[in-house]
Amino acid sequence: MTWHARLQLDYRREGPRTVAGFLHDGPLRILQSLYPEGGGICHNVLVHPPGGLVGGDTLDIAATVAPGAHGLVTTPGATRFYRSTGAPALQRTQATLAAGARLEWLPLEALCYSACQAENRLTLSLSPGAECIAWDVTALGLPHSGQPFATGRFTQHIEVPGIWLERGTIDAADGLLMDGRLGLAGHRCLASVFFVAGEALPRERREAALDAARAVIDAHALRETAGATSPHPQVVVVRVLAPVVEPAMELLRRAWGAWREHLWGLQPRQPRIWAM
C-alpha cells in the first residue's frame, strides 16, 4: 500500500501574534504551535507518523506565510527514503511568502537507504520584502551502522523560480561521483543552508551575510569541505560535505544562528525538539 499525503500550512498575522492553521489529508500533521520567542514567531513541528517513504509514496507539503507573519518549521527526525522495487518515492515542498513575511524551514535530514529510488523537491516563492532561511541535508546510507548506500538513486531539487535552481541525481553506482575528488570524495552527507530574499539584497547586507557565514566556517572543524557563496543577488548559500550528518548539521545551525543575529536582529533560539 502506498500513501499520497498532503499538508497545507498557513501562517497569518493576528495583531502582534503569528498564528498557524493547517489542513491535512493522510499521515501528515503539525503539532501544537509554540512561542518560545514571544507571539511574533510561531514554532511548529511537522510530523509524518509512518516515519518514512517507500516506492510509490508521495508527500505534498504546501506552506504560505502572510504579510508580517513569521513561521519556523522543523521535524522530529529524519525523512527516511526506504528501498524501492519500482516506483520512486517523492516529497514535494512548496513555500510561498507574501511581502514582509519570514519563514525558517529547518527539517532534519533526508536519509537515503540503499536501493531507494527517490526525489526530494523544495520550491520557495518569495514576494518583494519577504525573506527565508532554509536548509537541505542529505545522508546517504548509515555508514556507522554498516548500511552503506550501495545501490539506488536520489534526486535533489531546490528552486527559487526565476532566480536559482539546483538539481542533481546521486546514483550509488557512480563511483566518480561518490568517491572521486571532484565529487563527494567519500563523504556521505551533503548539506546546504540558504538565505533567500524576495528582492535583491543591498550590497552591504549581502556582504554581511557572507562574512557571518565565513566566520562560522573558519571556526569549524569542517572548514576544508565547506564554503559560502552568493549565486544570485537574492541568494546566499553555505554548502558542506561531511562523513556523517552530525558535524554538518552543527555547522548549518551555527550559520543559521549567525544569519538570524546579523540579518534579522534575532537571537538563535533553537526549537525545543532539537534538545530531545
From Swiss-Prot:
Q: Name one GO cellular component term.
A: cytoplasm
Function of the molecule? Required for maturation of urease via the functional incorporation of the urease nickel metallocenter.
Assembly notes: UreD, UreF and UreG form a complex that acts as a GTP-hydrolysis-dependent molecular chaperone, activating the urease apoprotein by helping to assemble the nickel containing metallocenter of UreC. The UreE protein probably delivers the nickel.
Q: Keywords on this record?
A: Chaperone, Cytoplasm, Nickel insertion
The cellular location(s) given in this protein's UniProt record come to: Cytoplasm
Native species: Paracidovorax citrulli (strain AAC00-1)
Q: What is this protein called?
A: Urease accessory protein UreD
Query: What lineage does UniProt assign to this protein's organism?
Result: Bacteria, Pseudomonadati, Pseudomonadota, Betaproteobacteria, Burkholderiales
The encoding gene is ureD
Please indicate which superkingdom the organism of origin belongs to. Bacteria
A GO molecular-function descriptor? nickel cation binding
Pfam families named in the record:
UreD
- Can you tell me which family this protein belongs to? Belongs to the UreD family.
